[in-house]
């Protein structure tokens, strides 16, 4: 009986090891895809906002309007594209312009289960605007657009899982990295 115990081979066959590794790989791939989908919406909308800011800057440099920009309403989690004259308080509702690729003049981030959690400048309503040279300006509430951006402007988007994504605008150039 003792001799029979030592004759039997104990352990796993190569087929068993391969099957376990394949199953572990499938489970890991499924878990990774679920986790990446949760962040895809936030990354996608942050990329869209970056494009919308770049578009506003391009319009400011290529049209006869004095200023083009993006207006952020943090309380309602919305933003929109606008134009207005330098040195004047803008009529935000009158000067809204539909962003290409959107159906409405206002982008409502709640539709995407996202929100604007903060901006680096100002309070509940903040404006980021560009002049015809692409120089960025900012204003709070309904102020006149006369404040040149002296430090980076940051808008923070967040989702329901407390994940965040920062969108930055560089002072002087207005570039969005």
Residue ranges and their predicted role:
Residues 8, 131, 171:
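Short, acidic, Ser/Thr-enriched surface-loop or helix-capping motifs
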Residues 14-15, 32, 36-44, 50, ...:
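Polybasic/polar functional segments that serve as interface/processing modules
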Residues 40-69:
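Membrane-proximal N-terminal amphipathic helix
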Residues 67-133, 166, 177:
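Type IV pilin-like appendage domain
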Residues 84-99, 138-156:
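Surface-exposed intrinsically disordered loops and tails
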Residues 135-137, 154-177:
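Low-complexity, S/T/G/P-rich flexible repeat/linker segments used as non-globular hinges
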